[in-house]
């Protein structure tokens, strides 16, 4: 084998080994985004930095009904984690969307069904809650105590 080809092959193998340590993209969050779009009117990015609980983490008192939806979703994921090896952010599930109706179709009691039920409830809650633009991108350190 040509030494140049051997070096290229070695470089590809090393790259693949390095890529194996990169965490997978969360497919569940992609499904959650699709559920939100099926049930509601806002684009999912409108919720990422909303209030005290929408997006990563959450503390303090929810600012409004929509923020309470996010707090409830966080608690729902916490409960789903109690079922064995259930990691909600990475667990994919089966559901159907007939706008605006969402139906989770995995077996009841399974990790996938529990996570789907959490996302379904949140998507429906988001669709029913008013969106207060003043609560988007707030300083969580001062508003969420």
Swiss-Prot record:
It catalyses: a 1,2-diacyl-sn-glycero-3-phosphocholine + H2O = a 1-acyl-sn-glycero-3-phosphocholine + a fatty acid + H(+). Residues 1-27 form the signal peptide. Ca(2+) binds at residues 53, 55, 57, 74. GO terms for cellular component: extracellular region. CDD domains: PLA2c. The active site is at residues 73, 119. Binds 1 Ca(2+) ion per subunit. InterPro entries: PLipase_A2, PLipase_A2_Asp_AS, PLipase_A2_dom, PLipase_A2_dom_sf, PLipase_A2_His_AS. It is found in: Secreted. SMART domains: PA2c. One of its GO terms (molecular function) is calcium ion binding. It holds the Pfam family Phospholip_A2_1. GO terms for biological process: arachidonate secretion; defense response to bacterium; lipid catabolic process; phospholipid metabolic process. It is an enzyme of class 3 (hydrolase). Disulfide bonds join 38-97, 52-144, 54-70, 69-125, 76-118, 86-111, 104-116. Its EC number is 3.1.1.4. Its cofactor is Ca(2+). Keywords: Antibiotic, Antimicrobial, Blood coagulation cascade inhibiting toxin, Calcium, Disulfide bond, Hemostasis impairing toxin, Hydrolase, Lipid degradation, Lipid metabolism, Metal-binding, Secreted, Signal, Toxin. Expressed by the venom gland. The keyword Iron does not apply. Belongs to the phospholipase A2 family. Group I subfamily. D49 sub-subfamily. Snake venom phospholipase A2 (PLA2) that inhibits blood coagulation and shows bactericidal activities against both Gram-negative and -positive bacteria (E.coli, MIC=0.4 uM and S.aureus, MIC=0.1 uM). PLA2 catalyzes the calcium-dependent hydrolysis of the 2-acyl groups in 3-sn-phosphoglycerides. Homodimer; disulfide-linked. This is Basic phospholipase A2 BFPA. It comes from Bungarus fasciatus (Banded krait). The lineage of its organism: Eukaryota, Metazoa, Chordata, Craniata, Vertebrata.
């Amino acid at each position: 084998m040509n030494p140049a080809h051997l070096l290229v092959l070695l470089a590809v193998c090393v790259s693949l080994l390095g890529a194996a340590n990169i965490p997978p993209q969360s497919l569940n969050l992609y499904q959650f985004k699709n559920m939100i779009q099926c049930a509601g009117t806002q684009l999912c990015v409108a919720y990422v930095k909303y209030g005290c609980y929408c997006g990563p983490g959450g503390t303090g008192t929810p600012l409004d009904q929509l923020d309470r939806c996010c707090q409830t979703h966080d608690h729902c994921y916490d409960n789903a984690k109690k079922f064995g090896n259930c990691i909600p952010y990475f667990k994919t599930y089966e559901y159907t969307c007939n706008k605006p109706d969402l139906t989770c179709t995995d077996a009841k009691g399974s990790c996938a069904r529990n996570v789907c039920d959490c996302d379904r409830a949140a998507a429906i809650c988001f669709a029913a809650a008013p969106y207060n633009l003043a609560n988007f991108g707030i300083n969580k350190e001062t508003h969420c105590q």
